[in-house]
Swiss-Prot record:
Belongs to the TBP family. This is TATA box-binding protein-like 2. Interacts with TAF3. Residues 82-150 are annotated as: Disordered. Its main location: cytoplasm. It holds the Pfam family TBP. HAMAP family: TATA_bind_prot_arch. It is found in: Cytoplasm; Nucleus. Keywords: Cytoplasm, Developmental protein, DNA-binding, Nucleus, Transcription, Transcription regulation. Residues 94-116 have a biased composition (Basic and acidic residues). GO terms for biological process: DNA-templated transcription initiation. Residues 118-128, 139-150 have a biased composition (Polar residues).
Amino acid sequence: MVGSLIMEEDIYLDLFLDPYTIQDDFPPAMSQLFSPGVPLDMHSLPSNPETVFHPHLGGVKKASTDFSSVDLSFLPDELTQENRDQTVTGNKLASEESCRTRDRQSQLQLPDEHGSELNLNSNSSPDPQSCLCFDDAHSNQPSPETPNSNALPVALIASMMPMNPVPGFSGIVPQLQNVVSTANLACKLDLRKIALNAKNTEYNPKRFAAVIMRIREPRTTALIFSSGKVVCTGAKSEEESRLAARKYARVVQKLGFPVRFFNFKIQNMVGSCDVKFPIRLEILALTHRQFSSSYEPELFPGLIYKMVKPQVVLLIFASGKVVLTGAKERSEIYEAFENMYPILESFKKV
C-alpha cells in the first residue's frame, strides 16, 4: 500500500516538473549584454556559421543558402558602363544648354556705347567651350594615368589668361628715323675712279676703305666697297631705302662697271617716340636687371634696355623720349614699344 502511494507521488511530481523542464531546455530570451550574471560561455555562437543548434530538438540543422525567395526589390539597380556614359552625356548637354541660355540673356541685356540694346541674331549660338559650367555632382577629377577627354584645351585656357603687358593700347606710334640696307653689285670696283668721276663723293683710303656717296632724293648716304658691296643709310622707309640703293647702283653702272643689283636686304631699322611723361630711370634699371638694362648717367644719359622678344634695343631717357633700334621689320618696332609702354607707365614720375 505504501509502495503504491510512493509511485503515485512520483507520477504527480513528474507531471508537475515536466513543464518547467521543457522551459529550461530553451536558451534565455534576453541577450547576454542584458544579463551580466550569466557566463559568456553558456551562449557562445557555434564555430560553423552555417549550422544552427536547436537544443529542444536535440540535433543540428543546416542553414538554408537558397535566397531565391528573398525580395531584393528595395536595392538600386547597378548602372552599366553604357548607362553611366549616357548619364554623363545627358548632364553635360544640360549644362551646356543652360550656359547658352544665360549667355543669350546676358548679351540681350548688354547695352552698347550709345545706350541702346544690342540686336542679336537668334540663329547664332555661342561656342560650347566658351561656357564654363561645372556640375559638382558629375565632375570627375582627371588622373595622370587617364587623361580626361572633357578637359578644356590648353589653347582655350591660355586665351582666358590676361596678358601683361597688354599690347596695342598706348595710342603712340613710333616714327621710323633710319633704315639701313645692303646690296651686292656683283662686280669688282675701282674706288679711285668712282671718287674722281662721280659727284658728291668722298674717298680717303687711309681713314676708311670705302667711297662715301650721297644723293638728295631720297636723302641718303651710301658706302661703296671695292668688293661690290653697298650699304645704304638714312632712308625713312623700306621703299625709300630700296630706291636709293638702286640709284647708287645706276651711278656706278654709268661709270663703265658691269653692275647687277643683287641681294637687297634690310639690316636695321631705327624708330623713336615720346611717351609725354618723365621716367624714373634709376628704379627701372634696378628692377629690370634680368633684361641686361644698364644705366650709367655719367657715361650716357639714357637707359639701355635689351628686349628678348622681339630682339630690339631701347634707349630710354628720363624726359620720356624712347629710341628703338635693332629691328629688321617695322612690326618689331611697334611690338617692342607696346610691350615696353606699360613698364614705363609703372615708373612714371609723379
